[in-house]
Amino acid sequence: MDPKTPIETVAETVATLIMEGKVLGFGLCEVNADTIRRAHAVCPLTAVQSEYHVMHRAVEFSGVLDVCAELGIGFVPYSPLNRGFLGGAINEFTRFDPSNDNRQ
């Protein structure tokens, strides 16, 4: 999404595509509670996706989960195992590609 384009404009475009039968639903990723409300007011959101796991719980405190529950929007957690760290895929022997090091 172009950050210079108002979310309402995006939602209007998606609503048109839904009415034309070209799109089944409207979802957003990594947005704040205000953006969710603004978009949902124009075109009902089906789902919101954000990073959420025991080490990254920002959506609990930012109002994202609350607004999704209030408006009946599905929430899809991204990286529930923290990109493999919580599942044991990453340990002290893991070697990272310097050109794609996500530890930063």
Predicted regions and their residues:
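Beta/alpha (TIM)-barrel catalytic core signal, keyed to glycine-rich beta->alpha loops juxtaposed to Asp/Glu
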Residues: 2-104
